[in-house]
Regions:
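Feature 926 captures the class I aminoacyl-tRNA synthetase adenylation module centered on the KMSKS loop
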Residues: 202, 418-478, 482, 527-570, ...
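N-terminal catalytic cores of NTP/NDP-binding nucleotidyl/phosphoryl-transfer enzymes
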Residues: 31-94, 147, 156, 216-219, ...
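Short, solvent-exposed turn/loop segments enriched in Gly/Ser/Thr/Pro and often Arg
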Residues: 34-36, 44-45, 78-91, 144-152, ...
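Residue patterns forming the tRNA-binding/recognition surfaces of aminoacyl-tRNA synthetases
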Residues: 3, 8, 17, 21-25, ...
Length: 902
């Protein structure tokens, strides 16, 4: 026996109970079923450091909608959940916690630190998982993964070794983005550019051979200590005489060459640029072209280098342990140990004192910052591991261009291709302890490098057993790039999950990580599995606050989804995040929107209670014979068929917001506001067969409507569904209504809609005239569609407050004291004089007429003004013409009503 619905719906408690039941029954676990087509989504793994924010809530809601929809369509729908180890963020959390205990990484050692990191992950890392469950995510938790679990680690090692053996991973001294705060390199994609106030300092370098001064400008004067050349353009006529000459570096007195290079732009400034190969990416390339030495003047924690730094590197070089391309290190003397900013001030003061600072020019420029800590990035030459991007990028670009993978919206295809074409080799090593340690070992005796999945026992070159593993870890995105297939059992290509569920289908993610993650998954999937990892990338925007601002800690405008869920329920939050949203576009959060969605939930609950309360104990669900269906039944069933087809089409095109909106409108405006009200007449009438037919249609439509709504609002739909007679174990495994061949009665629908339009017009007129519903009167309806209005007599009596209705093709009787109500299909004559205060109504109408004529005059004057018609935008002119026509129509109707009142 279905349980009775409570008087009010209370999501608190109810949602937790329902979710636990889903988990206990294993409804989210997807079996491999060869008779079904698989549909697979892998969750973009949230960081173990994180907690649910509005961006997560939207991202996961979209994925859950698609998963539930496909599950109901009969697919073997798998949504793989998991979390990311988040190297930099997690390490920072653990280091901060240790700092509170007076400890550092170095004090506890690598093993001790990793033990603490795993403890931290196990204590706090699953917090976000429990929060995802609060949202209603129907993930297969039995397949939950972590980017550092055994399977993912095996995949990471496999890929690293393969790429190394193919020559696509290499180690070398290259220019990298260095974060002095996080004390690690980061990739180009992880650098965020911020507009900052700064200066152009114009410096004077004396030419050794001629004694003249060369003027150049820099935003980073502290790096001049590492200059190894200045560059001019070979075609610049101003400096033809200086080809092959040298300048003397101010403060240091070091002679450096003047080189001719296209990097020097004749049109910019003086056309002279300082070249610091160890601290600028462009200068690094100039240095390679001219075989310039590299001199490092900054330590990895952002201080100027000193004697000890120089001695350490010199010793490595003397012992033959340093690579040939290892930069030299300068003892910066009096500036040693200063931070870069401290050194900048001191160097500028000294340059000014010796006459080498010509002028200071203020400017606003884009400065690279770390995406994690927002510290200013220092470009550094450092020995790191890199992935060669060009051979991997080419097939990844072709796959998208050929349509094997499509972006929704399509405009993001360009973002992806531009990023893939413009990227440098990917720096994948990080100077961190938490993460996948690079599977490379170095022989302490001969320096041989061994890359392997397992630690080598001896050096293959000299036989030594003194092998040391590279201390660095891999970029977090290296393991995340393998996520679509490492989560399904790869590199074991015989794994059942891999063979059945891979390639995956739809990736749902934000536009901000197309470069970070989407691109890398695409080239990884193609390179290692030979298949595109997914066929569709569905891009969503970000959730902004009600003023359109990005949510941030600094603004204090962040909204905690869990607090919203606690107050309004997960269904209301989910519906708010989907209604009105469109792929690729940002949306605004507001409490008012969530409240409106909660009100919709209450409306649905109350309507369902009404239906349940009108069912006898022996009620048998199912549609009645067609002969027992009246016009309103055929109309609601036809509307159901239409909304099911439309919602299906919208979901198939990833128009999730439109689908949700149509289902909500059907339930609220069509089913609740109209059909239920219409059924009350039959339910309370004496015709038992008509009442039973109404009950059957009410239940049938409610059942289908709940199924259409389920992907969007899973909790309340499950709770109501379980209270319906004949319900199955769970709504989530029921058949999706849009796949059924539901009948549409076009003629009956058209007739009923004519009737509805007329009823709406009568009710609007009565409301304007302040006529109480209890005051009823007769009416004459003039129409070319008499059948519709003759069949609808009962509806007119109840909803248009008619005592009796006369339907005619042409009304020729007296119109004295009658009010005219017109729709496109009918003209009604209603004797309202007996129901109203004539003088009061005339006063109201005359006031309305004055207002309408004022509007009429305003629009007429605008359109009679040649300047307006000629110079105003065409759209505005058309809108004004439309407003004029509406004002004319309104005034004419008011005059008719005044005339009718005599």
């Amino acid at each position: 026996m279905p349980k009775e619905l409570a008087k009010q719906y209370a999501p608190q408690g109810t949602e937790d109970r329902i979710y636990q039941n889903w988990c206990d029954k294993g409804y989210f676990h997807t079996l491999i079923d060869r008779s079904k087509k698989p549909f697979t989504i892998v969750m973009p793994p949230p960081n173990v450091t994180g907690q649910l924010h509005m961006g997560h809530a939207m991202d996961e809601t979209w994925q859950d909608i698609l998963t539930r929809y496909k599950r109901m369509q009969g697919y073997a729908a798998l949504w793989v959940p998991g979390t990311d180890h988040a190297s930099i963020a997690t390490e920072a959390k653990v280091v901060a916690k240790m700092r509170e205990e007076g400890l550092t990484k170095e004090m506890v050692g690598r093993d001790g630190f990793l033990e603490r990191a795993w403890d931290w992950k196990n204590t706090y890392g699953n917090r976000i998982v429990s929060q995802l469950k609060k949202l209603g995510c129907s993930c297969d938790w039995q397949r939950e993964r972590f980017t550092m679990d055994e399977g993912c680690s095996d995949a990471v090692k496999e890929v690293f070794v393969r790429l190394y053996n193919e020559g696509l991973i290499y180690r070398g001294n290259r220019m990298v983005n260095w974060c002095p705060h996080c004390n690690t390199s980061i990739s180009d994609a992880e650098v965020e550019y911020e507009a900052k106030e700064g200066s152009f300092w114009h410096l004077l370098y004396p030419v050794k051979e001629t004694g003249e001064m060369l003027e150049l400008a820099t935003t980073r004067p502290e790096t001049m200590l590492g200059d190894t050349a200045v560059a001019i353009n070979a075609e610049d006529p101003r400096y033809k005489h200086l080809h092959g000459c040298h300048v003397v570096l101010p403060l240091l007195g070091r002679e450096i060459p003047i080189v001719c290079d296209e990097h020097a732009d004749m049109e910019k400034g003086t056309g002279v640029v300082k070249i610091t190969p160890a601290h600028d990416p462009n200068d690094f390339e100039v240095g390679k072209r001219h075989d310039l030495p590299m001199i490092r003047v900054l330590t990895y924690d952002g201080h100027m280098t000193g004697a000890a730094d120089k001695a350490a590197v010199d010793a490595e070089k003397a012992a033959g342990r340093a690579a040939a391309d290892e930069p030299d290190v300068l003892d910066c003397g009096k500036y040693a140990g200063m931070t870069a900013l401290e050194a900048r001030k001191a160097i500028l003061a000294d340059l000014e004192a010796c006459g080498a600072l010509k002028e200071t020019e203020p400017l606003t420029h884009e400065v690279g910052t770390c995406y994690r800590c927002h510290s200013v990035i220092e470009p550094m030459v450092s020995k790191q591991w890199f992935v060669k991007m060009e051979p991997l990028a080419k097939p990844a670009i072709e796959s998208v261009e050929k349509g094997e993978i499509k972006f929704v919206p399509e405009r993001f295809t360009k973002n992806y291709i531009n990023w893939m074409k413009g990227g440098r080799d990917w720096c994948i090593s990080r100077q961190l302890w938490w993460g996948h340690q690079i599977p490379a070992w170095y022989c302490d005796d001969c320096g041989e490098t061994v890359v392997a999945k397992q630690a080598p026992c001896t050096c293959p070159k000299c036989g030594s057993s003194n092998m040391t593993q590279d201390p660095d870890t891999l970029d977090t995105w290296f393991s995340s790039a393998l996520w679509p297939f490492s989560t399904l059992g790869w590199p074991n290509e015989n794994a059942e999950d891999y063979n059945y569920f891979y390639p995956t289908n739809t990736l749902v993610t934000g536009y901000d990580i197309i470069g970070f993650w989407v691109s890398r998954m695409i080239f990884s999937g193609l390179a290692y599995t030979g298949k595109a990892p997914f066929d569709t990338v569905l891009i969503h925007g970000i959730v902004r606050d009600s003023q359109g601002r990005k949510m941030s800690k600094s603004l204090g405008n962040g909204i905690d989804p869990l607090e919203v869920i606690e107050q309004y329920g997960a269904d209301a939050l989910r519906m708010m995040l989907i209604i009105g949203s469109t792929a690729g576009n940002d949306m605004r959060y507001s409490d008012e929107k969530v409240l409106a969605c909660r009100n919709f939930a209450n409306k649905l609950w109350n309507a369902s209670r009404f239906v349940q309360m009108n069912l006898p104990e022996d009620f048998e669900p199912g549609l009645p014979e067609e002969s027992l269906l009246d016009m309103s039944d055929k109309w609601i069933l036809s509307e159901l068929a239409k909304v099911a087809a439309e919602a299906t089409a919208n979901l198939d095109k990833y128009e999730l917001g439109l689908a949700a909106e149509k289902v909500e409108n059907f339930i609220w405006e069509v089913y609740c506001d109209w059909y239920i009200e219409i059924c009350k007449t039959r339910l309370n009438g004496e015709d038992a067969a008509a009442a039973d037919a109404a009950r059957k249609v009410l239940v049938y439509v409610l059942d289908k409507a709940l199924k259409l709504l389920h992907p969007f609002m899973p909790f309340i739909t499950e709770e109501i569904y379980q209270a319906l007679p004949g319900s199955a174990e769970t709504i989530m495994n029921e058949k999706w209504p849009g796949d059924e061949n539901m009948k549409v009665w076009a003629e009956d629908c058209a007739d009923f809609e004519k009737l509805m339009d007329y009823i709406k017009a009568v009710r609007a007129m009565r409301a304007e005239m302040n006529v109480h519903p209890a005051k009823k009167t007769s009416m004459v309806i003039e129409t070319a569609s008499p059948a519709a209005f003759e069949k609808g007599g009962a509806y007119l009596a109840r909803f248009a407050f008619a005592t009796d209705v006369t339907v005619t093709a042409k009304y020729e009787g007296s119109t004295d004291g009658m009010v005219n109500v017109a729709t496109p299909d009918a003209k009604g004559f209603i004797p309202m004089m007996e129901l109203i205060d004539r003088d009061k109504e005339l006063a109201r109408l005359n006031k309305e007429l004055t207002k309408a004529e004022k509007e009429l005059g305003m629009f007429t004057n605008q359109l009679n003004n040649p300047k307006f018609v000629e110079k105003a935008p065409a759209k505005l002119v058309e809108e004004t013409r439309a407003k004029l026509a509406a004002a004319q129509d309104k005034a004419a109707k008011i005059k008719e009503s005044i005339a009718a009142l005599g």
